[in-house]
A protein has these predicted regions:
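HTH-adjacent hinge/linker in prokaryotic transcriptional regulators
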Residues: 2-6, 15-18, 22, 32-36, ...
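Glycine-rich phosphate/diphosphate-binding loops that line cofactor/substrate pockets in enzymes
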Residues: 120-132
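Glycine-rich phosphate-binding loops that contact phosphosugars or nucleotide phosphates
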Residues: 130-248, 252-261
């Protein structure tokens, strides 16, 4: 993918102005750095104006510089080591107003997720979950928190949910080896993508299960063999993976399947409320507590 974009820029070099050629050469040689530069900073770095950078972006086929920047970021996200992420964070964030910067970026991720995820694809994924004999959920490393959140609520909606855990490939396959054609397998992973999750999806697909991938782009290795692709933006804001948009998407999926099973969910919660009350699970708001 990176080669395609850089190749296209290189191929179109002859039709560029002198200043635009400077930008093109810099991006080809330093695309990992250029991906996180503003148009102004990139212009200053190569010695051209900000407007020249903007014109360059449109010249190479993008609506504007932000779209070119996003494309470059997409190309390198899975390549950055933790050390490189820390360096990028330092350059992007600085030490001031971090709260505002991070929350603003997360808001943008949710907005883009809503724009890019089709409602039809989302509803189809929800329907397949409702129809499943068994529901397997897998998320590894930082995605484990997402898988646990989904499993917690799905267990209150369905009797047939299996959260796949384990610190090794052997443990993982021991838990999913019975997955079959009437089951749904949900794999969750974001850059840097988990090899175990990809292998598990391959296995589930070979066994005839319906595969739902929750990931960041159609270029993700999870997308290749899934039946339903649910996309959530997790563009790197720092060395910490942003799970805000993925969690919002999963939250919506939980609500969607819950609304399709309102009667059953209502009965389940009525029983749970009795158990919670009988076994004093939650703190009660009592008056005159000293």
């Amino acid at each position: 993918m990176a080669k395609d974009l850089l190749h296209n820029i290189s191929e179109g070099m002859s039709g560029l102005s002198k200043g635009q050629k400077l930008i093109a050469r810099y991006i080809i040689e330093n695309y990992d750095k250029a991906a996180f530069m503003t148009a102004s900073k990139l212009g200053n770095t190569v010695g051209v104006s900000e407007s020249t950078v903007v014109r360059f972006a449109t010249e190479v086929g993008f609506e504007g510089y932000p779209q070119l920047q996003r494309a470059l970021q997409e190309l390198i996200r899975n390549r950055l080591t933790a050390v490189q992420r820390m360096e990028v964070t330092s350059e992007q964030m600085g030490e001031h107003d971090i709260l505002s910067k991070v929350l603003t970026m997360d808001i943008e991720k949710i907005r883009r997720t809503l724009e890019e995820q089709s409602n039809e694809g989302f509803e189809a994924a929800a329907d397949s979950i409702i129809a499943a004999k068994n529901i397997y959920i897998l998320g590894i490393r930082s995605s484990a928190a997402l898988a646990q959140f989904m499993s917690f609520y799905f267990n209150q909606i369905f009797p047939n949910v299996r959260l796949v855990t384990g610190s090794s490939a052997s443990e993982m396959f021991e838990q999913i080896f019975r997955v079959g054609k009437d089951d749904v397998f949900i794999g969750i992973s974001f850059p840097r993508y988990s090899k175990r999750t990809v292998k598990a999806i391959d296995y589930a697909k070979e066994r005839g299960a319906t595969v739902i991938a929750i990931t960041d782009s159609a270029g993700s290795p999870l997308a290749a063999k899934c039946d339903h692709l649910l996309l959530a933006r997790s563009d790197m804001a720092s060395f910490v993976d942003s799970l805000v948009a993925p969690l919002s998407l999963i939250n919506a999926l939980i609500v969607a399947v819950g609304m399709r099973r309102q009667k059953e969910v209502g009965e389940t919660y009525a029983q749970l409320e009795k158990i919670w009350d009988e076994y004093d699970v939650y703190e009660k708001n009592e008056e005159n507590i000293v």
